[in-house]
Amino acid sequence: SVDVPQARLLGERQLKFLDAWAQDWTDADLKAALSQTIFCGGAHIHGSIGGRLHADLDSNGWPQTGRNKAIGALRKAFAFHYAGDQHLATVFHHGIDEWRDSIYSFCVPSIANLYLRWWKPLEPGKNRKPGQDSILGDHLDGFNNKVTAIAVANPTPEKGGDKLTTRAAGFG
């Protein structure tokens, strides 16, 4: 894929902060990290039904080396990751070496979501529970990051799709 190991997602100062934060549990029972976007390519279709992207560089799934450092640091803190900016509500369990060996993320969409995105992998997910939709389960995103789709609020492709009710606006 397009990994550039020397490219930075988080700087050294940010990674040092996360390392110290992970070790300090003073007056804390739970930790959550807030950021602009999730650490994977969380959508395949952009803008309209035919707008498939292989990999979205507007996500924190790239560079993969930096992504793995970031979620590795958050994993040490047992932190839940809460983010936005993917225009699509999702819950992912991220993986570094194996599927589901790192953090969970919850991405919320905009309240008035005018730019549609869908999670619609070409291959069915692996290791799904019986009866689960084929879009769920273990996948590789466009950057070959290991992600497990737990929940996705794809917009409904129906007539009158310009209405906010069909855009999964505010679903999360």
Task: Label every model-predicted segment.
Residues S1-G172:
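Long, structured stretches of catalytic cores involved in phosphate-ester chemistry, encompassing
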